[in-house]
């Protein structure tokens, strides 16, 4: 019955996995979208899961900690994922190669082959932040031809770019 109402009234659900290196801004983004305000966060050990409704889409967002010790556990969250949000700490030029490796490890997993990919180029408000075109190049996105991906500049603290990213997800998700 619920699926019938969804088809009639346009409500969709989408399972989103939010990944990125530690301190990229994943949890700040999650709670900015959920609560509309900035919250003080601590490093995520384990995961946070919240439902965010935007434009008649219920996003079930799984924010899993980014510390290197728990990254091997990420794959346990892949099944059923329809969209990947990968958050990049744009001023952190020293770890962009590490971010690229982790991104490609995720998207090359067979469980993630159908997921669309949104990159939040985060912390655009900070000096020396890499711009979206630079993130696109450094993450090797132009070589990904068989997947739908997009780089959205963002600032988790202010909320800039976050809803534009969700708009891209809603426009590009095929249920």
From Swiss-Prot:
Stated role: GTP-binding protein involved in protein trafficking; regulates endocytic recycling and cytoskeleton remodeling. May modulate vesicle budding and uncoating within the Golgi apparatus. May contribute to the regulation of dendritic branching, filopodia extension and dendritic spine development.
InterPro entries in the cross-refs: Arf6, P-loop_NTPase, Small_GTP-bd, Small_GTPase_ARF, Small_GTPase_ARF/SAR
Cysteine pairings via disulfide bonds: none
SMART domains: ARF, RAB, SAR
Lipidated residues (N6-myristoyl lysine): 3
GO cellular component: cleavage furrow; cytoplasm; cytosol; endocytic vesicle; endosome; filopodium membrane; Flemming body; Golgi apparatus
Subcellular location: Cytoplasm, Cytosol; Cell membrane; Endosome membrane; Recycling endosome membrane
One MF term in the entry's GO annotations: GDP binding
Catalytic activity: GTP + H2O = GDP + phosphate + H(+)
Gene that encodes the chain: arf6
Pfam family, one: Arf
Family designation: Belongs to the small GTPase superfamily. Arf family.
Matching SUPFAM superfamilies: P-loop containing nucleoside triphosphate hydrolases
Binding locations of GTP: 23-28, 41-44, 63-67, 122-125, 155-156
Name this protein carries in UniProt: ADP-ribosylation factor 6
NCBIfam families, sorted: small_GTP (TIGR00231)
């Amino acid at each position: 019955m619920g699926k019938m109402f969804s088809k009639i009234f346009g409500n969709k659900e989408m399972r989103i996995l939010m990944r990125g290196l530690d301190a990229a801004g994943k949890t700040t983004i999650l709670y900015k979208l959920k609560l509309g305000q900035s919250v003080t966060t601590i490093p995520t050990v384990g995961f946070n899961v919240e439902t965010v409704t935007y434009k008649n889409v219920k996003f079930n967002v799984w924010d899993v900690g980014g510390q290197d010790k728990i990254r091997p556990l990420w794959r346990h969250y892949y099944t059923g994922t329809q969209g990947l949000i990968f958050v990049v700490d744009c001023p952190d030029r020293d770890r962009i190669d590490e971010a690229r490796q982790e991104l490609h490890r995720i998207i090359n997993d067979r469980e993630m082959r159908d997921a669309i990919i949104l990159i939040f180029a985060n912390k655009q408000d900070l000096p020396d932040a890499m711009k979206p075109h630079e993130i696109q190049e450094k993450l090797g996105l132009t070589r990904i031809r068989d997947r739908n991906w997009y780089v959205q500049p963002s600032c988790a603290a202010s909320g800039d770019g976050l809803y534009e990213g969700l708009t891209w997800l809603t426009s590009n998700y095929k249920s």
